[in-house]
């Protein structure tokens, strides 16, 4: 597959139009708005950037790289192990539901689009639940998308969904959201670099320590008025 074909496949996979429901989740951002921690564009940008650098970069992003590596190697045992590990690290019912629902939707799409080999699709179908990073890395391997490029798209898509949530819930203007997303490019690149460092370590350096995020996600479960499912 040529570089241009890979780029188009990556744009397809990271598109907000992909029918996996990412727009319906805020991952604690809505609770941060409710309690006043996020109340304008600068605080929203700081929240999203800090989440990228200090939460995603320490756990989900390096785990994403490990999953991509094991899908490429055809190592179904390690894929299942890391999928189950990631599911166990989701601290609240909403975060678990989010990764389960989006992972299931993407796995179903992979099957319907017949991406990848039959063996890859069978391994993915056998996972229950299947988490979003597991399904996304399977799609990247199926479409011959490299690890760094795929992770950058995954992190940018995450940031894009967060900015869209901030636009709706703070609320912010569309242009303010685009300025914010542009300034977050550096945080996305930092996240990819840190994830590569952590994934290459022996053993991999993964950390799930994000107590404030866990508390806010738990509070969101009983929040009176909500736009988002997490």
Curated annotation (Swiss-Prot):
Gene Ontology terms for molecular function: nickel cation binding
Coiled coil: none
GO cellular component, one term: cytoplasm
Pfam families per record: UreF (PF01730)
Location(s), subcellular: Cytoplasm
Keywords associated with the record: Chaperone, Cytoplasm, Nickel insertion
UniProt entry tagged with the keyword Chaperone: yes
Biological role: Required for maturation of urease via the functional incorporation of the urease nickel metallocenter.
Subunit structure: UreD, UreF and UreG form a complex that acts as a GTP-hydrolysis-dependent molecular chaperone, activating the urease apoprotein by helping to assemble the nickel containing metallocenter of UreC. The UreE protein probably delivers the nickel.
Family to which this protein belongs: Belongs to the UreF family.
Protein name listed in UniProt: Urease accessory protein UreF
Organism for this UniProt entry: Cupriavidus taiwanensis (strain DSM 17343 / BCRC 17206 / CCUG 44338 / CIP 107171 / LMG 19424 / R1) (Ralstonia taiwanensis (strain LMG 19424))
């Amino acid at each position: 597959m040529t570089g241009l074909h890979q780029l188009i496949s990556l744009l397809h996979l990271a598109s907000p139009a992909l029918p996996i429901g990412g727009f319906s989740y805020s991952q604690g951002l809505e609770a941060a708005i409710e309690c006043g921690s996020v109340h304008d564009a600068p605080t929203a940008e700081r929240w999203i950037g800090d989440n990228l650098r200090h939460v995603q970069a320490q756990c989900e992003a390096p785990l994403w790289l490990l999953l991509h590596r094991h899908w490429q190697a055809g190592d179904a045992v390690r894929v299942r192990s890391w999928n189950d590990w990631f599911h166990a690290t989701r601290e609240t019912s909403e975060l678990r539901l989010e990764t389960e629902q989006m992972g299931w939707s993407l796995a179903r799409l992979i099957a319907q689009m017949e991406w990848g080999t039959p063996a890859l699709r069978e391994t993915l179908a056998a996972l229950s639940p299947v988490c979003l990073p597991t399904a996304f890395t399977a799609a990247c391997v199926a479409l011959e998308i490299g690890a760094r490029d795929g992770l950058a798209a995954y992190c940018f898509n995450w940031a894009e969904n967060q900015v869209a949530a901030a636009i709706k819930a703070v609320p912010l203007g569309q242009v303010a959201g685009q300025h914010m997303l542009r300034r977050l490019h550096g945080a996305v690149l930092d996240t990819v670099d840190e994830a590569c460092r952590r994934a290459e370590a022996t053993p991999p350096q993964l950390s799930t320590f994000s107590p404030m995020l866990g508390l806010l996600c738990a509070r969101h479960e009983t929040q009176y008025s909500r736009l988002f499912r997490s």
